[in-house]
């Protein structure tokens, strides 16, 4: 496995911090790391609200990447509360596809860090609804 995956896992784990902000808002139960094409790692946590205005950890990390002036994603990893990994939800996949419409197929997604199982976004999202 490439060294960058360990760096991403550690970066996401460092911000994984589940907490209740108010009776309506919680955050940090899921954390994500996105590696841009430049090799820089951006992190984010999920924000859950009582009225569905929350955001997934992956999108939060992508928004941090965009805030810092980058827009090309190379790798994505998310960590669940138990330390396991999972695939991005449909909304997160859609954002990645729209950001990289002609290149999204090659974005790497960590499915299982312990087993070193990596898939391509193109395998998870083989046909984009717009094209």
Regions found by a protein language model. Name each.
Residues 1-22, 70-131:
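C-terminal binding/interaction regions
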Residues 26-36:
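Short beta-strand scaffold segments in enzyme catalytic cores
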Residues 27, 56, 71-73:
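Short connector loops at helix/strand junctions that flank enzyme active sites
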Residues 40-41:
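Hydrophobic "anchor" residues
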Residues 45-59:
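Compact, glycine-rich, soluble single-domain proteins
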Residues 60, 64, 88:
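Feature captures the catalytic cores and cofactor-binding loops of soluble hydro-lyases/lyases
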Residues 64-70:
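Alpha-helix C-terminal capping segments
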């Amino acid at each position: 496995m490439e060294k960058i995956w360990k760096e991403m896992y550690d970066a996401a784990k460092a911000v994984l911090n589940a907490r209740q902000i108010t009776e309506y808002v919680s955050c940090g139960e899921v954390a994500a790391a996105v590696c841009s094409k430049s090799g820089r790692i951006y992190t984010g946590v999920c924000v859950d609200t009582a009225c569905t205005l929350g955001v997934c950890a992956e999108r939060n990390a992508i928004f941090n990447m965009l805030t810092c002036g980058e827009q090309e994603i190379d790798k994505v990893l998310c960590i669940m509360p138990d330390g396991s990994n999972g695939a991005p939800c449909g909304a997160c996949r859609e954002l990645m596809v729209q950001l990289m419409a002609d290149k999204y197929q090659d974005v790497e997604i960590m499915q299982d860090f312990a087993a070193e199982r990596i898939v391509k976004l193109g395998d998870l999202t083989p046909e984009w609804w717009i094209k």
